[in-house]
Structures are given as structure tokens and as C-alpha cells.
Amino acid sequence: VVLDLGNGTFGALQRYLDPFALDGVILSHLHPDHCADFSALTVYRRYHPHPPPGGMMPVYGPPDAAERLIAAYAPNAEERNRTNLSDLYTFRPYGGVTARIGALGILAAPVEHSCEAYAVRISHAGRALVYSGDTGPCPQLVKLATGADLLLAEASWPDRPDNPAGIHLSGKDAGKAA
């Protein structure tokens, strides 16, 4: 799986993994720095001369992910009328229950950011990784991270009392959440 597809991540991904080997996409939120390369993945999957057989790819994200990602891929009405991406993806909004991508359990919790955003807990064989996505300090992240083996947390703010609330973590905030 891939956790977010911000600008430049698709090119980097291809250095290490065939994009057709992906079993799913998990999007924390829909700001471009977390999903801009979804369009690159879509072009690759749609127009590759030798795609593997089968395979709708699940995309987990906020409820409006399908609409927003279709608009990013097909920016005008004529093009949107020709595709809704349902030939490539099954869009699945987070629903507060554990979902599955293969053997992985996926559980998301809403967190505090400037738009609808989620932290995600990925579990397998009794181990768990929690990805914060963009968030300010919040009890939902702490609850989701409790007992996890690893917290992958963004920490964009310096540790200052005048940071805008509910947008990003500082390194100190990330440490407290862990």
C-alpha cells in the first residue's frame, strides 16, 4: 500500500516498486501535498501498454475523495463525462471500522487539520503502524497510536506556543502522541 501520494512521490515510488504491485492507496486528506500524484498513478494505470490483468485498486480516504480526485484527473466537464475512474479504482470512505487491504487491517480516525483529515492505523500479525497524516495535537491521534509499534508522525511546526492550533504537530507534539 501507499500512504498518501503527494507531489513527487510517484516518481520516487517507481524507483523501488512496480506501481502495479500496489494493493491499495490510503489518503490521509486531500490537500495537494498529500494526493497530487494520484493523477500520475491514474495515467500509469490507464495508459500503460502492458497492464497486468484484473484489478480494481481500493482507495481509502475522506468521503469526497472520488469527486475531488476525478476533478484533479479530468479538470473539465467534457473529460469528466468520459470517466469517473470506476474502471480503475473502488473508492472507499473511512467508516470508523477496520477495513482490509489484503492481510492488512486499516482503521482511520478523524484528526484536527484545516480540512477533513484522518490518521490511519495499519495492522498485521499483531503489529501496528500509525500514520498521523497532517494534524494538530488531538486525543484521537493519541488513542489511535496507543499500543502501536511505530508512529509515523508529521512534525512541520517548530516547538513554539504561537503555532496555529489544529493544523500541524511539532516534534515535541509528535513525541507526546507516541
Feature-to-residue mapping (PLM):
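Cap/insert and terminal regions of metallo-dependent hydrolase folds
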Residues: 136-178
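Generic structural signal for conserved hydrophobic packing positions in ordered secondary structure
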Residues: 13, 38-41, 69, 120, ...
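Core dinuclear metal-dependent hydrolase active-site scaffold
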Residues: 1-18, 90-143
